[in-house]
């Protein structure tokens, strides 16, 4: 036995398998496996032996696959033969049914004699004739079962054909939205899928009433997004919808929350875009992503593109820290925003594409982008009334003690942002639990009942939380925002 023989047998086995001659292939595979087993006993080197064992396992897997194919083919043959046998049996069974009505003894008997005999001797012929008729037309139980089976099968076939017709009608209505799918010809498939993942299909479930205060910002967003779809005949020409809205303000004032409310309430295709979506390490891919984003937005219009922290994407151009790739991406973004195929070009407000942006650093944004974001609104810190309303929204699921005065708490929170107020409410709601488990072992904590843990939040809890949590926005920051909005604002 030589290695050359093993190699030749493996080649023959694979060739026979490819040609569909699985029986011959299995013979060669089995011979190769036996030859390799004999060869393995003669190999002394452990490293070489491991390699041969690995090869043996691979060929064994191939042999198993061929064996599975043979089993599948055999099952097909069994099904065909059983069907053919059933078809051959059916005429024989039917022949037995119809052979009885034509007995040989009936032919020589003349009809008139039969009738006369029935008149003279009524009992005997009367008893014989029904017996022959019954024998002729009474099917056997097996044939009755077959006939019933045929009727049931024919009924099932009719129901299945009706079901198929209904199914064929249903997908036309159900899959009609799926047919309206963006054609990404000319773009990388991964880029298209990455941007499709940024389309918010799930409802963020944030309503306008979930946002305290910010009445002017809500009105502007409704005017920019909702009203053009309700009154398309009005928003034409100089009254065209706003192409871009920039929300400016300190952190934690509700800019991203407003964007979530737009996605929930406005019923437009909502693209949630960040710097990671539009940047790539490959040359020229960032510009393609920007162009693809706006083409998809035009296709799925009316659409809203929300760019959070837009200062990180489109900062001021011409600085020494700017890279060439970043500059090209900014240029493409500016071109696409100015040429958005929405109401400004098509005079169709229902096909608009609006860019909604948010930033904490408006002074770092490029001047050309600032011009394209036509409405620049200030999202300030909540007022006293807004703070009280935000407290009610945050604490609506909690049980409060009778001594809690939300108006007094709101007055003590002057200068706090919306996020700061939420943190105070969260910390105050945990105070009662902290007092309850103080000094207890882990086992005792696990055995506490739900009623023991759900205790009302008191005024003292809020006072302690206010001492622990300070405001996150300084007066100097507020002054800087107000100065910028006075100079560049467009409310």
From Swiss-Prot:
SMART domains: AAA (SM00382). ATPase activity is stimulated by microtubules, which promote homooligomerization. ATP-dependent microtubule severing is stimulated by interaction with KATNB1. It is found in: Cytoplasm; Midbody; Cytoplasm, Cytoskeleton, Microtubule organizing center, Centrosome; Cytoplasm, Cytoskeleton, Spindle pole. Residues 101-182 are annotated as: Disordered. Residues 1-75 are annotated as: Interaction with dynein and NDEL1. Transmembrane segments: none annotated. Its main location: cytoplasm. Coiled coil: none annotated. Phosphorylation by DYRK2 triggers ubiquitination and subsequent degradation. It is an enzyme of class 5 (isomerase). CDD domains: Kp60-NTD, RecA-like_KTNA1. Residues 145-169 have a biased composition (Basic and acidic residues). One of its GO terms (biological process) is microtubule severing. ATP binds at residues 249-256. GO terms for molecular function: ATP binding; ATP hydrolysis activity; dynein complex binding; microtubule binding; microtubule severing ATPase activity. GO terms for cellular component: axon; centrosome; Cul3-RING ubiquitin ligase complex; cytoplasm; lipid droplet; microtubule; midbody; mitotic spindle pole. It catalyses: n ATP + n H2O + a microtubule = n ADP + n phosphate + (n+1) alpha/beta tubulin heterodimers. Can homooligomerize into hexameric rings, which may be promoted by interaction with microtubules. Interacts with KATNB1, which may serve as a targeting subunit. Interacts with ASPM; the katanin complex formation KATNA1:KATNB1 is required for the association of ASPM. Interacts with dynein and NDEL1. Associates with the E3 ligase complex containing DYRK2, EDD/UBR5, DDB1 and DCAF1 proteins (EDVP complex). Interacts with KLHL42 (via the kelch domains). Interacts with CUL3; the interaction is enhanced by KLHL42. Interacts with KATNB1 and KATNBL1. HAMAP family: Katanin_p60_A1 (MF_03023). This is Katanin p60 ATPase-containing subunit A1.
């Amino acid at each position: 036995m030589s290695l050359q023989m093993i190699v030749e047998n493996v080649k023959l086995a694979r060739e026979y398998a490819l040609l569909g001659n699985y029986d011959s292939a299995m013979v060669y595979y089995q011979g190769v496996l036996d030859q390799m087993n004999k060869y393995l006993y003669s190999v002394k080197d452990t490293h070489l032996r491991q390699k041969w064992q690995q090869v043996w396992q691979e060929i064994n897997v191939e042999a198993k696959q061929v064996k599975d194919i043979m089993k599948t083919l055999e099952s097909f043959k069994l099904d065909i033969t059983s069907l053919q046998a059933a078809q051959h049996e059916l005429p024989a069974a039917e022949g037995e049914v119809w052979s009885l009505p034509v007995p040989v003894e009936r032919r020589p008997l003349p009809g008139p004699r039969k009738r006369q005999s029935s008149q003279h001797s009524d009992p005997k012929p009367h008893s014989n004739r029904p017996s022959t008729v019954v024998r002729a037309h009474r099917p056997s139980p097996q044939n009755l079962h077959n006939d019933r089976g045929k009727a049931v099968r024919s009924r099932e076939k009719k129901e299945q054909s009706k079901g198929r017709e209904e199914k064929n009608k249903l997908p036309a209505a159900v899959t009609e939205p799926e047919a309206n799918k963006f054609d990404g010809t000319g773009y990388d498939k991964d880029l298209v899928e990455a941007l499709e993942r940024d389309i918010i299909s799930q409802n963020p479930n944030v309503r306008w009433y979930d946002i305290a205060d910010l009445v002017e910002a809500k009105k502007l967003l409704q005017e920019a997004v909702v009203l053009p779809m309700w009154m398309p005949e009005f928003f034409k020409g100089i009254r065209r919808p706003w192409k871009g809205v920039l929300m400016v303000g300190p952190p934690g004032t509700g800019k991203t929350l407003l964007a979530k409310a737009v996605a929930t309430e406005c019923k437009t295709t909502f693209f949630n875009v960040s710097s990671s979506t539009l940047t790539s390490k490959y040359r020229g891919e960032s510009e393609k992503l920007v162009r693809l984003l706006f083409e998809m937005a035009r296709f799925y219009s009316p659409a809203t593109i929300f760019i959070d922290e837009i200062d990180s994407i489109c900062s001021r151009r011409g600085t020494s820290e700017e890279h060439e790739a970043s500059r090209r991406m900014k240029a493409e973004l500016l071109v696409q925003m100015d040429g958005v195929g929405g109401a400004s070009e098509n005079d169709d407000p229902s096909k608009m594409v609006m860019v909604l942006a948010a930033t904490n650093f408006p002074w770092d944004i490029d001047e050309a982008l600032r011009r394209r974001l036509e409405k620049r609104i200030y999202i300030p810190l909540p007022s006293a009334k807004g703070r009280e309303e935000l407290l009610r929204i945050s604490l609506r699921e909690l049980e409060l003690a009778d001594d809690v005065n939300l108006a007094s708490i709101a007055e003590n929170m002057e200068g706090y942002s919306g996020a700061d107020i939420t943190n105070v409410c969260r910390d105050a709601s945990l105070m009662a639990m902290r007092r309850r488990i103080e000094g207890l072992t882990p086992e005792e904590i696990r055995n506490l009942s739900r009623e023991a843990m759900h205790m009302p939040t008191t005024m003292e809890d809020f006072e302690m939380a206010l001492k622990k949590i300070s405001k996150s926005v300084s007066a100097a920051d507020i002054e800087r925002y107000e100065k910028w909005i006075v100079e560049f604002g467009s409310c």
